[in-house]
Amino acid sequence: MPLVSISDAQRVPIQNANVVATVYHGLPLDLHQPTFNPRGGYLAFLGRISPEKGVDRAVKVARTFGIPLKIAAKVDRVDEAYFREQIAPLLKGPDLQFIGEIDEQEKTDFLGQALALMFLIDWPEPFGMSMIEAMACGTPVLALRRGSVEEVVEDGLTGHIVDSIEEATVTLPRVMALDRRAVRRRFEDRFSATRMANEYVRVYNSLLVRTNVKLVPNQAEPLHTTAAELANEPSESIH
C-alpha cells in the first residue's frame, strides 16, 4: 500500500515501507494571527507533559537565562506520575507558570506574546505541530536537533537548532532577536493548509495516472482552506 510520510525523518524507522511522498502538515492561514511586537516577556512551552517532550529542559534553559517560562500542556493519565514526581517540583516560583491545556484561540495569544517557543525534545519527533503553530504567530523556535526539526525549522531564519542544553542557553538571545515578520512569511510559504491539500492532490493524481482518472479535473484551480471553512466542514481524524 502506498504511504505518505509527514516528514523525511518519519521514514527512517520504516525504510521498507512503500512511502511515495512526504507532505508536511499545514494550517489555515487565518487560524493564528501573528504578533510582531510581543509584550509577554516570557518563553513558551506548548505540547504534552512526558519525558520525551523536554519540559524539564525548557525549565532549565529558562531559569539559567533568567526569563519566565509559561507551560501550556496536557497531562495524559499515563504521564501523571511523571508530572507529579518530576515536573511539579520544578514549577515552584514566580518565574514558572503551568497553564494546562489550551484551545486554538488561546494558542494565538499564548504563542504570539512569547519571545520564543522551547522545543527541546528528546525523541525522533515525526513532525511537531507546535513549531508551525508558533511560526504562524511570528514566534521563533529554539529546538534540539531531533527527528523532523531540521526539516521544519530553518536555522537562523525561523529559529535556531542546537545540539545540547548548554548550546540552547547560549543561543537563546539570537532566537529572540530573529525577525518575526520573516518567521510568519516562511510559515505562509511552507506550511499553509492550502499547500498541504494541493500536495496531497498531486500525490493522489500520480497514483491514479495509470487509470487516466484525475482526482481534481482542473488542477489549475487552487484549493482554498480557511479556518472558517474548516469549522463548517465535517471531518474524521485517525489517531
What are these regions (language model features)?
Residues 160-182:
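C-terminal "capping" alpha-helix adjacent to the active site of nucleotide-linked donor transferases
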Residues 2-4, 17-74:
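Conserved donor-binding/catalytic core segment of Leloir-type glycosyltransferases
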Residues 136, 140-143, 153:
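Short hydrophobic beta-strand element within catalytic cores of glycosyltransferases
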Residues 112-126, 139:
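Acidic donor-binding loop of glycosyltransferase active sites
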Residues 145-156, 160-163:
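Short acidic/histidine- and often glycine-rich active-site loop of Leloir-type glycosyltransferases
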Residues 73, 84-105:
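Nucleotide-activated donor-binding/catalytic signature segment of Leloir-type glycosyltransferases, i.e.
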Residues 177-202, 217-221:
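A short, well-ordered alpha-helix in the C-terminal region of glycosyltransferases
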Residues 128-131, 149:
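Short glycine/serine-rich donor-binding loops of glycosyltransferases
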